[in-house]
Amino acid sequence: VAVYYDQALTEFAYIEYSETGNEEYNIASGQSHVELFNAVLPAMFDSVVLVDSIEAASELGVDAIFAPVIEEFQLALPAKTKLDVYEVWIKYNMRLMTSEGDYIADWVLTSYGKTPTESLRSAEAAINEAAVVALRDLASSFSLSFTQVPEVRDWLTTL
């Protein structure tokens, strides 16, 4: 399987602005998403190769191309929600294509993480911990649900 990470994923950053329009939090997590998939995918497939483009994958004659996309990122702060937790919610669009770039499967996965405010000393540490929990949630739900996606299951029977 070839894996393609587009620039939007590798350089992903979520910026939370204050009510006055000033940057309050900047969560640059693109590399964390890449590292997560780079850890999970080799456990799921015999061979995983990173490619710089869909076209490059086509030239390799791989069985499929996997290209994850972050569709949405939400951050919930105690000051805004009036709850004593920091929460991170991430919505992904998982795309699996043939080596020619044609659709095999396209499905949505969400991940969620939260951290109680009293467990950490700073907002930055709490947000980071909530994001780590959300990424762990993604790793487990992706690996456990992959073969449950009907189009993926159908594709796997052709290999």
Regions inferred by a protein language model and the residue ranges of each:
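A general alpha-helical scaffold signature found inside nucleotide-binding enzyme cores
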Residues: S32, E87-K91, E129, V133
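Short beta-strand->alpha-helix linker/helix-N-cap micro-motif
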Residues: N38-L60
